[in-house]
Amino acid sequence: MSWQVGTIGNLATLQRGYDLPDSAREPGPFPVVGAAGPNGFHSEARTAGPGVTVGRSGGSIGKVTFVSEDFWPHNTCLFVTDFKGNDPRFVAYLLGTLNLAQLNSGAAQPSLNRNFVYGVRIRSGLY
């Protein structure tokens, strides 16, 4: 394996999570994962596990969570929609080693824009 310089955009594709007000939650087995990690359950999953989320708003901006099962990614996080052939656990580990909070693009409310994340340079044996 040779290590290459690339970007997060080479490693994975991110998408903003889905809205789910507390009033719309229905009891169920699927974790709802937000900026700070799991924050409840719902009757429906929006994406298959394993998955990786990154906190995109508030005090948990940049927090990385690995999710082993199907789940609902909440709108307070970004989630990986395409691992581009890379191992999800390694992607979670690598993202967790980066200081993604430094990419804050918000003013009063911290916010993480996936387009800024894509350009972060990394060195990896993946891609």
Explain the meaning of each model-derived region.
Residues 1-34, 123-127:
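Non-catalytic DNA-recognition/assembly elements of restriction-modification systems
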